[in-house]
Amino acid sequence: MQEKSIRLGIVVAEFNYDITQLMLQKALSHAKFLNAEVKVVIKVPGTFDMPLAIKKLLEKDFIDAVVTLGAVIKGETKHDEIVASQTARKIVDLSTEFNKPVTLGIIGHGATHEQAVERIEEYATRAVEAAIKLVQRTRKIDELKEVKETVIID
């Protein structure tokens, strides 16, 4: 049986564009390398603006998972903490609401610009890999009928 292809949506923040644009390039090339199809890329102003775009993608039957890409850079106030924590919370809520993976490829909070630059490839590729693995594994869960012994899904 041939495995169904994995269809991704990507939501990328424009804020800190020098970082997020490189993250998008890394994510697109890594998805291609892993034979996943990126169906839609949506650019939003900032990470705090991601949830609505994520929700719109999750509503589509042709999207199996959503990858988020962004960079929340530390400032002089606690704004970065609020943005990062609220966005992460909503991402989890949307994933469980729609029963589809939404992965967190958002650098920060607390990261300096230099630290964010160092983490571009790591965060982008890990978010893509996590989305693909979660789709594959949740498909295996969906195929389970009855379990008499311990099943390890990896």
Swiss-Prot record:
Residues involved in (2S)-2-hydroxy-3-oxobutyl phosphate binding: 76-77, 119
GO CC aspect terms: riboflavin synthase complex
InterPro entries in the cross-refs: LS, LS/RS, LS/RS_sf
EC number: 2.5.1.78
Record bears the keyword Transferase: yes
UniProt keyword annotation of Transferase present: yes
Pathway: Cofactor biosynthesis; riboflavin biosynthesis; riboflavin from 2-hydroxy-3-oxobutyl phosphate and 5-amino-6-(D-ribitylamino)uracil: step 1/2
Location of the active site: 79 (proton donor)
Known catalytic reactions: (2S)-2-hydroxy-3-oxobutyl phosphate + 5-amino-6-(D-ribitylamino)uracil = 6,7-dimethyl-8-(1-D-ribityl)lumazine + phosphate + 2 H2O + H(+)
Residues given in the record as 5-amino-6-(D-ribitylamino)uracil binding sites: 15, 47-49, 71-73, 104
Entries under CDD domains matching the protein: Lumazine_synthase_archaeal
Any one GO biological process: riboflavin biosynthetic process
Superkingdom, taxonomy of origin: Archaea
Pfam families per UniProt: DMRL_synthase
MF terms in GO: 6,7-dimethyl-8-ribityllumazine synthase activity
UniProt KW keywords: Riboflavin biosynthesis, Transferase
Protein purpose: Catalyzes the formation of 6,7-dimethyl-8-ribityllumazine by condensation of 5-amino-6-(D-ribitylamino)uracil with 3,4-dihydroxy-2-butanone 4-phosphate. This is the penultimate step in the biosynthesis of riboflavin.
Protein family membership: Belongs to the DMRL synthase family.
PANTHER family attached to this UniProt entry: 6,7-DIMETHYL-8-RIBITYLLUMAZINE SYNTHASE, 6,7-DIMETHYL-8-RIBITYLLUMAZINE SYNTHASE DMRL SYNTHASE LUMAZINE SYNTHASE
NCBIfam families for this protein: lumazine-synth
Descriptive protein name: 6,7-dimethyl-8-ribityllumazine synthase
Source organism of this protein record: Saccharolobus islandicus (strain L.S.2.15 / Lassen #1)
Name of encoding gene: ribH
